[in-house]
From Swiss-Prot:
Keywords: Isoprene biosynthesis, Manganese, Metal-binding, NADP, Oxidoreductase. 1-deoxy-D-xylulose 5-phosphate binds at K113, S139, E140, S164, H186, S199, N204, K205, E208. It catalyses: 2-C-methyl-D-erythritol 4-phosphate + NADP(+) = 1-deoxy-D-xylulose 5-phosphate + NADPH + H(+). This is 1-deoxy-D-xylulose 5-phosphate reductoisomerase. It is an enzyme of class 1 (oxidoreductase). Catalyzes the NADPH-dependent rearrangement and reduction of 1-deoxy-D-xylulose-5-phosphate (DXP) to 2-C-methyl-D-erythritol 4-phosphate (MEP). InterPro entries: DXP_reductoisomerase, DXP_reductoisomerase_C, DXP_reductoisomerase_N, DXPR_C, DXPR_C_sf, NAD(P)-bd_dom_sf. The keyword NADP applies. SUPFAM superfamilies: 1-deoxy-D-xylulose-5-phosphate reductoisomerase, C-terminal domain, Glyceraldehyde-3-phosphate dehydrogenase-like, C-terminal domain, NAD(P)-binding Rossmann-fold domains. Pathway: Isoprenoid biosynthesis; isopentenyl diphosphate biosynthesis via DXP pathway; isopentenyl diphosphate from 1-deoxy-D-xylulose 5-phosphate: step 1/6. GO terms for molecular function: 1-deoxy-D-xylulose-5-phosphate reductoisomerase activity; manganese ion binding; NADPH binding. Its EC number is 1.1.1.267.
Length: 367
């Protein structure tokens, strides 16, 4: 029986990962969560994990509910003996547990794009040193991974990520009118609040471009974004002979989570079959309407700590927007200001965390 650790178990991806584990009959040996007491309690009761990580404020109540429960840090949960760790703690908070999982040599099903964006070269160095696998959970990167299977790297001309365009592809005309409630209504995907807002600004696609650059170790100038409102095509690879290879599937993250857990095998699912689409639209992204995508590309051109800074600044800006402190168009403005002020230093674990802290404070100044 395959043993799985789920980091970020009470979040959207974490809960869907547990659904996949239930369908596949896997053993969940470790859970790491935040402060959602009731959701975590249900998971502990169902899975009876060996170790659990949660915010310290929950420890007393968890001990009362589950007297024999062993509490630990997220890094200790990540290091448990298991075949796979699902890394789904969002933001830079998920980086240390992801690194801990990589250092134990297990497969890491990576849903935390910020970890790869900020620390891609460092994580790959750790993975190669410890014999770990890193497989993507993001639908677009899973699509590219699948389309690249069996192909020679020198035959690949371009990687193409698709974006639904989010809820504001065409309206309202004035994005200053956008409220948090409007931004949280994504037309296609079931996701957490932060990534849903990022999808609305298209910064999520920018992060995915940077993730693709680091995950596939591919030149930024050969990674393209196309708006695809139907969201049937999740990613395409263009080859040097002009042909294209695409992955299509339903807009259900469980499909991509399962693939990261079962690869190289495929397993049956109870998911609905994709209806054969009548029309597939592909549009160029409007960088004037969605400048956050342009900021992400500029961060990618600078590389290293610039990617760390914009990722950290975005967490602060999105939280400020969700709290009603700033208007929607202010998010990309904050990212651009932080990027311009980012110091140029070599990327190390120490400089990464230092710039992450600096960028958050800098973003708060503008928020």
């Amino acid at each position: 029986m395959k043993r799985v650790v789920v980091l970020g178990s009470t979040g959207s991806i974490g809960q869907q990962a547990l659904e996949v584990c239930r369908l596949r009959g896997y053993e969940v040996v470790g859970l790491a969560a935040g402060k959602n007491l009731e959701a975590l309690s249900r998971q502990i009761a169902l899975w009876k994990p060996r170790l659990v990580a949660a915010e310290e404020s929950l420890h007393k109540e968890l001990k009362a509910r589950f007297p024999g429960l062993r509490l630990a840090t997220a890094e200790e949960v990540a290091a448990l003996e298991a075949e796979v760790a699902v890394a789904a703690i969002p933001g830079l908070a998920g980086l240390a547990p992801t690194r801990a999982a990589v250092r134990t040599g297990k497969r890491v099903a990576l849903a935390n794009k910020e970890a790869m964006v900020a620390a891609g070269p460092l994580l790959w160095r750790e993975a190669e040193a410890h014999g770990a696998e890193i497989l993507p959970v993001d639908s677009e990167h899973s699509a590219l991974f699948q389309a690249l299977l069996g192909e020679r790297r020198e035959d690949v001309a371009e990687l193409i990520l698709t974006a639904s365009g989010g809820p504001f592809l065409r309206e309202p005309e004035d994005l200053a009118q956008v409220t948090p409630e409007m931004a949280l209504r994504h037309p296609r995907w079931r996701m957490g609040p932060k990534v849903t807002v990022d999808s609305a600004t298209l910064f999520n696609k920018g992060l995915e471009v940077l993730e693709a650059k680091e995950l596939f170790r591919f030149p930024l100038e050969r990674i393209q974004v196309l708006i695809h409102p139907q969201a049937y095509v999740h990613g395409l690879v263009r080859f040097v002979d002009g042909s294209l290879k695409a992955q299509l599937g339903p807009t259900d993250m469980r499909l991509f989570i399962q693939y990261a857990l079962t690869y190289p095998e495929r397993a049956e699912t109870p998911l609905k079959d994709l209806p054969i689409p009548g029309v597939l639209e592909f549009l160029e992204p409007d960088l004037k309407r969605f400048p956050a995508l342009a900021v992400a590309y500029e961060a990618g051109r600078r590389g290293g700590l610039a990617q760390v800074a914009v990722s950290a600044a975005d967490e602060v800006a999105v939280e400020a927007f969700l709290q009603g402190k700033i208007p929607f168009p202010r998010i990309p403005e904050i990212l651009a200001r932080v990027l311009e002020a980012t110091p140029t230093e070599p990327l190390t674990w120490e400089s990464l965390f230092a710039v992450d802290a600096w960028a958050r404070e800098e973003a708060k100044r503008w928020a």
